[in-house]
Amino acid sequence: MGPETDAFLTEVLREQQAAEVAFRNGDAEPRLALWSCQEPMSWLGQYGACATGAADVREHFRRVATRFSDPREFLFELIEADAHGDAAYSVGFEHFLGSFDGHPDTVMTHRVSRVYRREDGRWRIAHGHGDVAPWARRSSSRA
C-alpha cells in the first residue's frame, strides 16, 4: 500500500475498532460519528436490509445496535484498502463473539465494505455493505 493509503488507515482503523466494539455493546453513537451527514449515503446489509439517506442509516444502526451486547471479542481483519485524494475504501471481515438477540456465545463473521470521502479534513463513511461471510453462512444454522 502507498503512503496515502497508509495515512488513511492510520486515521481510520483505531477509531473504527473502538466504534464497532461500542456498537456490539448496544451503543450506535460512536459508529454514527464515523458516518457522513451529507448526502448521498447508504447502507446495504444482508437479507435485504437497506438504508438510504442520513436519517434512515442512523435509525437502522440504532435499531440494530440494540440487538448486540457483551462483546467479549471483536476483531476487524483488513483484506484490502486504497485511498486517493478525497476518496477511499476498505474491505474486510468483522469477527465477533458475544450476545446477539439474547443468545450468549454468538459467533459471527461479517464481510464488510466501506466507501469513504474526506469531509472537512476527516474521513467519513458514505456507503457501507455487510453480510455474513460465505463460509460462515454455510456452517451456521442461524444464517
Regions found by a protein language model. Name each.
Residues 1-36, 41-143:
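A beta-strand edge to alpha-helix "cap/lid" segment located at domain peripheries
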